[in-house]
UniProtKB/Swiss-Prot annotation:
It is found in: Cytoplasm. Keywords: Cytoplasm, Schiff base, Thiamine biosynthesis, Transferase. Transmembrane segments: none annotated. GO terms for molecular function: thiazole synthase activity. This is Thiazole synthase. The active site is at residue 96. Belongs to the ThiG family. 1-deoxy-D-xylulose 5-phosphate binds at residues 157, 183-184, 205-206. Its main location: cytoplasm. It comes from the Bacteria.
């Protein structure tokens, strides 16, 4: 049986759950990562303190792949600068390009994201661009050298779930790269539904960081993502447009 792995930039991951780290108490990160079974975690450089204070890198378990993001970047130039800084800090070649200059809704700037992706891909980064679900933009990101496509489900931190569901389905059908749902997933059930649709992975942060029991919620997401993936690979049962179909014979049971 073929091994089911997520492949990004030539690297293989058995976990399809990418954990965000932006809102955690540092002391809970290790437990969340372990319960999530996550092999990749996002990293905002402002939390990687190299001047002697608390450093998030000290709390991330060994062997977990770092995914530095360009949080705070307002244009391609700033995103490229942050990515280069992350590499200089030995955070590796993965980078999540996140470019936002809309401070109210925190929606990504797709066009600046394309520009940054092209520059960074040429420099050997494994670029994972965060974007608004748009097929034409996704195609441009593929051509720019992206390693995957990361459409938002709903606005960052909203926990509103799969508001862009129909557009994500289009990306799954039309784009050959892994589609990783990012931002807005608020419940394990929503993560499961995304995986059932055929996305390659799910990233979650706020839904876990704001839960009553953070490690337990991380574990719940892990199970939901695994269940959704298994359902997708199994082939979901058909849905009738109308009427019903008995699951047991309606004749030949009670006879005179």
């Amino acid at each position: 049986m073929k091994k089911d792995v997520l492949t990004l930039g030539g690297h293989e991951f058995s976990s399809r759950f990418i954990l965000g780290s932006g809102k955690y108490n540092l002391n809970l990160i290790k437990a969340a990562v372990e319960n999530a079974g996550a092999q990749m975690i996002t990293l905002a450089l402002r939390r990687a303190n190299t001047s002697g204070g608390e450093n998030i890198l000290d709390f991330i378990p060994e062997g977990v792949t770092l995914l530095p993001n360009t949080s705070g970047a307002r244009n391609a130039e700033e995103a490229v600068r942050i990515a280069r800084l992350a590499r200089a800090m030995n955070c590796g070649d993965f980078v999540k390009v996140e470019i936002i200059h809309d401070s109210k809704y925190l929606l990504p700037d797709n066009y600046e994201t394309i520009k940054a992706t092209e520059i960074l891909a040429k420099e050997g980064f494994i670029v994972m661009p965060y974007m608004h679900a748009d097929l034409n933009v996704a195609r441009d990101l593929v051509n720019a050298g992206a390693a995957c496509i990361m459409p938002l489900a709903s606005p960052i931190g909203s926990n509103k779930g799969l508001a862009t569901k129909e557009f994500i389905k289009i990306l799954v059908d039309e784009i050959d790269l892994p589609i990783i749902v990012d931002a807005g997933i608020g419940r394990p059930s929503q993560a499961c539904e995304a995986m059932e649709m055929g996305v390659a992975a799910v990233m979650a942060n706020t839904a876990i960081a704001t839960a009553g029991d953070i490690p337990a919620m991380a574990g719940a997401f892990k199970q939901a993502i695994e269940a959704g993936r298994a359902a997708y690979l199994s082939g979901l049962g058909r849905v009738l447009d109308k009427g019903a179909s008995a699951s047991s014979p309606l004749t030949g049971f009670l006879e005179d």
